Amino acid sequence: MWIGVISLFPEMFKAITEFGVTGRAVKHNLLKVECWNPRNFTFDKHKTVDDRPYGGGPGMLMMVQPLRDAIHTAKAAAGEGAKVIYLSPQGRKLDQGGVTELAQNQKLILVCGRYEGIDERLIQTEIDEEWSIGDYVLTGGELPAMTLIDAVARFIPGVLGKQASAEEDSFADGLLDCPHYTRPEVLEGLTVPPVLMSGHHEEIRKWRLKQSLQRTWLRRPELLEGLALTDEQRKLLKEAQAEHNS
């Protein structure tokens, strides 16, 4: 997978390209991340990349010409088929379904805004989609872009040790993840649930599903509203609710 990034702070993306799972993906040529800095497309000695908004008001906007030229350069490097995404509080909120959609693309160009944002005409002419990571404001689009890259990269074949890891993560089936345990067997008086040490794989599967349903019901009940639960899931959820309320 190829991802191009337009950012005034490309150095920030070393966190993605040099560390952890995504760093290994880059090292093994499963993921390629290229960055373009709009400052490198300026023509004045100060490398100006911000400009005043028409109509006045606080703050500045990213200057059109350097940003536009950076986007065009990234598009040329990507070739055909690249989807251009602007990270914006006004965008569609990123969730696991959205991550799965974006992971189907082999080429993405991520535009990271700064200041008060970018000219609306650039959004109309250069941007394919706007995405947000939540209903709050950050100082720039770099952290949302890194979040998106990390989430999408998990679906690239070979990036995770087991592809099942991505398929069984929280939200992969619309539910929160179940609790997990490792050694020691007893920690400050708290023990590992016996079923997890039983060796009965079917019982372990049912326990994990039941815990996942219960955790979603207790912590994020709105997630259940849009799910078409199976007969087994409905049965296990009723059991979990009865146990919790008893």
Swiss-Prot record:
UniProt keyword annotations, A-Z: Cytoplasm, Methyltransferase, S-adenosyl-L-methionine, Transferase, tRNA processing
Family: Belongs to the RNA methyltransferase TrmD family.
Transmembrane region(s): none
Enzyme class: transferase
Protein name: tRNA (guanine-N(1)-)-methyltransferase
UniProt GO molecular function: tRNA (guanine(37)-N1)-methyltransferase activity
GO annotations of cellular component type: cytosol
Domain of life: Bacteria
Gene responsible for this protein: trmD
Keyword check for Cytoplasm: yes
InterPro entries from the UniProt entry: Alpha/beta_knot_MTases, tRNA_m1G_MeTrfase_C_sf, tRNA_m1G_MeTrfase_TrmD, tRNA_m1G_MTases_N, tRNA_MeTrfase_TRMD/TRM10
Record's subcellular location: Cytoplasm
PANTHER family in the record: TRNA (GUANINE-N(1)-)-METHYLTRANSFERASE
Catalytic activity: guanosine(37) in tRNA + S-adenosyl-L-methionine = N(1)-methylguanosine(37) in tRNA + S-adenosyl-L-homocysteine + H(+)
Residues the entry annotates as binding S-adenosyl-L-methionine: 113, 133-138
CDD domains xrefs: TrmD-like
Pfam families, per the entry: tRNA_m1G_MT
Oligomeric form and interacting partners: Homodimer.
Example GO biological process: tRNA N1-guanine methylation
Annotated SUPFAM superfamilies: alpha/beta knot (SSF75217)
Enzyme Commission designation: 2.1.1.228
Reported function: Specifically methylates guanosine-37 in various tRNAs.
